[in-house]
Amino acid sequence: MKNFNLILVIGATASGKTRLGVELARQLEGEIISADSRQVYKGLDIGSGKDLAEYGEVPHHLIDIVEPGHEYNAFQFQQDFFEAFTYIESRNKQPILVGGTGLYVDAVVSGYEFVQLDKDLALRAELDLQPLEQVQKLLLELDAAQYEKTDLTVRPRLYRAIEIAKNKQTNPKPAKALPEIRPLYFGIQWDRKVLRKRIKTRLKERFEQGMVEEVQGLLDNGVSHEQLEYYGLEYRFVSQYIAGQIGYEEMFDRLNTAICQYAKRQETWFRRIEKHGGKIHWLQGSGDIYQQACEVLADLG
């Protein structure tokens, strides 16, 4: 048995993830699962960077599966992912996850247990008064397995994990077992200045392709400005431009800056993967990333 059953292609926005995922799928008889929180929506094409033509003959999953206006979340993604993953594996094909949205990837690899549970405001107020180390210790005592899955540096996530652990004690029931994921991470790395240039170039291309018209079409079809805020940076800023809140140049500059800031936050997420024991095989974007990935696969046997 090979030591991985899921290839993950990660990297900052505009790093070339889809292209690498497609090339690997062709080489390995694979199928792509998108881990992008916006590409699930029909009609969110240019702003979400679907690039469907790039897939060619390669089968892809979790793209264009819900209508705009539906609030799709990480719990639904986890369910849909494992359905696609099981289907791909059952046909002896290689699943390749291309992402994307950090929470979605975490939901798959970490096997988050999603629970429909209200916040315990009294408990949270009590935990607010305790040192972080004491809160971490409480979670460890309640549920060691949940402790291992949780980002221990973020209080809201710790609080949620404690709420889930306490709920398990009072309402024990067997969780639905999720398939085991053995990940192989490929990360695409660019010099920061080069990445910023790629982001700006891609943004210009998206406006030339009709991103403003795409957002106007969504509004015309009943998607509200408030819902567009939920669909991420491109839709948020273009919506503000259409509403007359900002001019075109200001919209472009602010959007470009916001995307670059988002790329920096993605780097923080990559470091967290490594901090928690994930091995990322970094590929240099300035070189032939496909060839670099093939060399890693050859070394792994």
From Swiss-Prot:
One Gene Ontology biological process: tRNA modification
Ion transport is among the record's keywords: no
Family matches, as SUPFAM superfamilies: P-loop containing nucleoside triphosphate hydrolases
Names of required cofactors: Mg(2+)
UniProt GO MF annotations: ATP binding; tRNA dimethylallyltransferase activity
Site (Interaction with substrate tRNA): 101
Pfam family, one: IPPT
Residues given in the record as ATP binding sites: 11-18
Protein's recorded name: tRNA dimethylallyltransferase 2
Organism: Shewanella sediminis (strain HAW-EB3)
Classification lineage: Bacteria, Pseudomonadati, Pseudomonadota, Gammaproteobacteria, Alteromonadales
